[in-house]
């Protein structure tokens, strides 16, 4: 069976995702499409708008054959680690092709850029450090400056959000298994972070979340496939944002000592002190970010750091594993054919997982379900089995 892998958040699953999924299957001639999906919290450092099990249902209803959870310790980090670990899982599960959307739209250029970085790794790392020192800027900007300086302006624009992820997928594939084929299609209509829905059928997930959180579910339905609309209408829980977790973060920052927070993943350069001061003044999470931000810390980095503090995520990360959130019959058939040759632990029943392997994931789910209205999902990792569809 020819397998294509995609890396997703489906926050929520919308028409753009449906287009991407259909193209992945069509252009790669895949027998099975496997999605590695973020769980309770996503890469921008915020809670998913609805639980991972509902988003898994959306994925399966739209045609994904298997949904594998990207562990929270990787799903909530910067693009390098996010991509490395997603590719590690897809490689372990033996996909032939990694398919992604990008602003650039030419897969060969991503591969070429990745090869150049791998072949010039020492020079590239040195250029990043020089940019950090000389310009006192964020790591992301220093990375971009170093890339432009060494490889020119025209190879690949890694200031674009989907190009960044695509580049890091390509880089991870070069380092882990260069035989993985890369394919990409240009993103259509909506930009990744566009906050307004300006097209008849395609809008960014950001714009769709904005509509849903404003109570405009029916208006958002223009941008969602019928299967997603049905799941959203039947969902009885709340639609979530940082608003639902601000008081928990505020308490955590106020009660913790500065030295205690130094050991949290992503905390550096004394940023915890600014965060603790802001926590006593801010009225909400948006205020908190405004009071905390500096030239060296982008909003996304601040959100990720705040999330690691909320989750009490220590500097070490968990070991990778393959945790199945859901499958259809094709996905089940594929897993049955390949499971003996998969090197990572395969988890379908959480209670049978190796001791300690899921500790961070379980804690993240428990914190996520503290939000009012999620009582039915509490301890869901134990009582909600993988979703199996016909």
From Swiss-Prot:
<feature type="binding site">
    <location>
        <position position="162"/>
    </location>
    <ligand>
        <name>ATP</name>
    </ligand>
</feature>
<dbReference type="InterPro" id="IPR008513">
    <property type="entry name" value="tRNA(Met)_cyd_acetate_ligase"/>
</dbReference>
<dbReference type="GO" id="GO:0016879">
    <property type="term" value="F:ligase activity, forming carbon-nitrogen bonds"/>
</dbReference>
<feature type="binding site">
    <location>
        <position position="101"/>
    </location>
    <ligand>
        <name>ATP</name>
    </ligand>
</feature>
<dbReference type="GO" id="GO:0005524">
    <property type="term" value="F:ATP binding"/>
</dbReference>
<keyword id="KW-0963">Cytoplasm</keyword>
<dbReference type="GO" id="GO:0005737">
    <property type="term" value="C:cytoplasm"/>
</dbReference>
<comment type="similarity">
    <text>Belongs to the TmcAL family.</text>
</comment>
<feature type="binding site">
    <location>
        <position position="187"/>
    </location>
    <ligand>
        <name>ATP</name>
    </ligand>
</feature>
<comment type="function">
    <text>Catalyzes the formation of N(4)-acetylcytidine (ac(4)C) at the wobble position of elongator tRNA(Met), using acetate and ATP as substrates. First activates an acetate ion to form acetyladenylate (Ac-AMP) and then transfers the acetyl group to tRNA to form ac(4)C34.</text>
</comment>
<keyword id="KW-0694">RNA-binding</keyword>
<protein>
    <recommendedName>
        <fullName>tRNA(Met) cytidine acetate ligase</fullName>
        <ecNumber>6.3.4.-</ecNumber>
    </recommendedName>
</protein>
<keyword id="KW-0820">tRNA-binding</keyword>
<dbReference type="Pfam" id="PF05636">
    <property type="entry name" value="HIGH_NTase1"/>
</dbReference>
<dbReference type="InterPro" id="IPR014729">
    <property type="entry name" value="Rossmann-like_a/b/a_fold"/>
</dbReference>
<feature type="binding site">
    <location>
        <begin position="7"/>
        <end position="20"/>
    </location>
    <ligand>
        <name>ATP</name>
    </ligand>
</feature>
<dbReference type="GO" id="GO:0000049">
    <property type="term" value="F:tRNA binding"/>
</dbReference>
<keyword id="KW-0067">ATP-binding</keyword>
<keyword id="KW-0819">tRNA processing</keyword>
<keyword id="KW-0436">Ligase</keyword>
<dbReference type="GO" id="GO:0006400">
    <property type="term" value="P:tRNA modification"/>
</dbReference>
<keyword id="KW-0547">Nucleotide-binding</keyword>
